């Protein structure tokens, strides 16, 4: 059933209908469309369009339809309706007859779809927040279990300074906490209702839009009808949140892919999140992580595509805006799936402590400690930096770590170096000295874990 047609003398070409119709994807807004219609029916009573008995009949029929949709949402796709609004109205008319045709009084699909999408976005944000916090919790638990797992920290993918696996986990907790904050901020701007703005100029009926917004769970109604029906900032904002969040998950995946590789060997992934090769029987591939990394690109593309769609649109509504949903649905589905999958990867991961520690002792990751030692002896840092660089060259020439160089060799580069240098060069000393807030010292890591547990109510 089309919601228009009186103006036209010819039927739409079937090819245009297939091109124009959106039911194949906006069917996902069915529940929100029904909920919005119930609220609108109540508003129509307040302005005398519906009697209380008529509204009751409509609400009862809509609630029955809501249960039918929840039981089998795929039934919607069997229809040739243009969009979800047409489908809901058609089903309502099937149930209550001519009365169903009164429901759309004073309402446009422009404010209707804007309301539906905002309601869907609000619900989806809550799902994303839950999944985000579940992953943060998994990272904190993994950190707590691996506070003593010393491993190399990297810059430029070169061993730089020793850290712990716990400290690495907590770095991603921080990223996810920022993602959580962005979603919460987005939710605040989502929480205004456009229903009652009509096609673009507002409704001709004196409906209390603030009351209507409250019935739908919004904190307030929007202030300008032109903006309200054409606003898709929330779509851009959620896509941006997703793009940033997926960058974080992609980096998480890349790190673990490397840590799991034969070249690093710091962790072993569970069989539950890996797959094999059809040819090479020895392979155990990190497919879950590679797919997280790969799916990141689709989400970035959705954001870019939506920005390009909106950038040249005049006020108010244009059919271009129908393109807001597929990319948004796909991007947020991906983000949600990847949050769940990342948590599953952590469930069963094994950290290979001996291999991690062995790698941390290689690559001259304690060179900065020697420079700090020299500074403590009164050597200016820039000079100390140069001295240590020369010492590292000598250690490389001898094929030894810095702490294995004889004192006589170290003193060739600076006479201030004494026997007290060797304890300073130990891995434990490297960690212990990073005791400022946010550092890798055991005390700071333990405190960060405790703080995260309080914030996450673990």
From Swiss-Prot:
Q: Which UniProt keywords apply?
A: Amino-acid biosynthesis, Arginine biosynthesis, Cytoplasm, Lyase
InterPro entries this protein is in? Arg_succ_lyase_C, Argininosuccinate_lyase, Fumarase/histidase_N, Fumarate_lyase_CS, Fumarate_lyase_fam, Fumarate_lyase_N, L-Aspartase-like
Asked if the record carries the keyword Lyase, the reply is: yes
What EC number(s) has UniProt assigned to this enzyme?
4.3.2.1
Q: In which pathway does it act?
A: Amino-acid biosynthesis; L-arginine biosynthesis; L-arginine from L-ornithine and carbamoyl phosphate: step 3/3
UniProt record similarity statement: Belongs to the lyase 1 family. Argininosuccinate lyase subfamily.
Would you tell me the protein name for this molecule?
A: Argininosuccinate lyase
Q: Which organism is it from?
A: Salmonella typhi
